Amino acid sequence: MSDPRHIAIIMDGNGRWAKARGLPRSAGHRAGVEALREIVRAAGDRGLGYLTLFAFSSENWTRPSGEVSDLLGLLKLFIRRDLAELHRNNVRVNIIGERAELAANIRALLNEAESLTHRNTGLNLVIAFNYGSRDEIVRAVRSLARDVAAGLLDPSSISAELVSANLDTAGIPDPDLIIRTSGEMRLSNFLLWQAAYSEFLFLPCHWPDFRPADLDAAYETFRQRERRFGGVEPRASADAEEEILCPSTKGAAV
């Protein structure tokens, strides 16, 4: 199989990484940002077309207020510190998620990241912020319903393609590969519509330990698979894949 065009990552395990080292959760989030920087550079170096990162879920607001403040602070710091470098490296930034109820200063930062880089032609970095897939689908359905109510749309003409065109990810290809770190095996309300034919890779390492070598291993795993799209072609065995998962943490303490 050819290399993936679009990889999406659920960056999980910052808190557990910190706990295992006797550190506060905030230290795990800071380490996670360092891993994010490294992987964005690696993705660009490898010619990846699209990299989507689940940065902040719409459910994350229920976390302790101090942790939420830390996460928002890291987002703002990342954009202020890294946006110029992303722009120099020809990275285009796209933000998906609900923005209407965000604080004005956060909305301004997100808008700045998109507007500065919108002409870039390299890696498309898609940041899912205040994102929940069910909410995204509901908003798309409401948009279509308004068009129907206004007489602008015949209900019989609504198709999967039209729904896709009303999602936050309109114009972005569906992910070929979705990676989740930390050993959890669920999507957690991430790209539910778009993941219909994605390949999945659930890795045991926590996000701060994820390195370019692990990204390369994910590429190799993807190459071993046969995407069937409902067909009957065989795929690589799980035993074969297990040999190349998280090589950067082989023999290391969790």
Curated annotation (Swiss-Prot):
GO cellular component: cytosol
Keyword Metal-binding annotated: yes
Chain sites annotated for binding substrate: 13-17, 25, 29, 57-59, 61, 63, 180, 186-188
A GO MF label: ditrans,polycis-undecaprenyl-diphosphate synthase [(2E,6E)-farnesyl-diphosphate specific] activity
Record-linked SUPFAM superfamilies: Undecaprenyl diphosphate synthase
Pfam families assigned to the protein according to its UniProt record, in alphabetical order: Prenyltransf (PF01255)
Cofactor binding comment, as recorded: Binds 2 magnesium ions per subunit.
InterPro entries the record matches: UPP_synth-like, UPP_synth-like_CS, UPP_synth-like_sf
Highest taxon, organism lineage: Bacteria
GO biological process: polyprenol biosynthetic process
Family stated for the protein in its record: Belongs to the UPP synthase family.
Protein role: Catalyzes the condensation of isopentenyl diphosphate (IPP) with allylic pyrophosphates generating different type of terpenoids.
Quaternary structure (record): Homodimer.
Name of the protein in question: Isoprenyl transferase
